[in-house]
């Protein structure tokens, strides 16, 4: 039986600025499909490894746009739920001079808060190899409980769980420290960025992260590349590997680069790639992402 990949989490709309500067000074934005799990799902599809995607979309105009994008990318709608009484979450992006970004979220009464994983039955999970989840659905109930239920059932079915914390402090409505500790204890592969680590949610020491639960930790550092730190329980055994990344002279936007990296990691994990090969591939996918306007609805060549 062919083993599948399941990505689960939010899809939302990113508004990408047409110029650099503070949000209050930007005069024009472009609408783009986004949300870290949605970006990962689309990235995998563009790498010819189309996953299942479990999400909840509104039925407003933005929700219809997201559904259209997912359909265009060939992602099955079997686990795409609809919430007719909700709106689509919005994220406005602002860029500094170095192309880095900040997010301003509008997330009241939105569909992602109604995230529902009940449609993914245990029988489905028996055919799944890797389940990918993110941190945003952990920030609010009932989405938090739905995420944990899916992960618990996935582990019971023998799936590997890949987790990207995607820390957004302004979104938390439940205790972040307790939630993150529980999630780390259920994680096989963790992918984190410099921005995710530290504070009250995640330790900065890779060994502490491994002690918290994961067998493998991928730490990204933007254009400085990434590291993989793993213990004996990982597919690669115990060790540490590094890739220095790729120089990109024409960076347009870094939004979604981390999600592209995650897609590369999952693809390599499913393919059984060696650590050096996997890191090089994931860094290449992420680097290419920075050369186009961000999000799921950008140029399809981005992760090909």
Show the residue positions of the predicted features.
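Glycine-rich phosphate/adenosyl-contacting loop at the front of the ribokinase-like
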Residues: 1-75
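Conserved phosphate-binding/catalytic region of the ribokinase-like
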Residues: 3-6, 203-304
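Active-site metal-binding loops of divalent metal-dependent hydrolases
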Residues: 11, 136, 260
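Short glycine/proline- and charge-enriched loop/turn segments
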Residues: 19-27, 105, 239-246
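Short, conserved phosphate/pyrophosphate- and ester-handling motifs at nucleotide-, phospho-/glycolipid
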Residues: 44, 193, 258
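Conserved N-terminal subdomain of the carbohydrate kinase-like
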Residues: 50-133
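Conserved beta-alpha-beta core of the PfkB/ribokinase-like small-molecule kinase fold
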Residues: 130, 135-208, 212-216, 222-226, ...
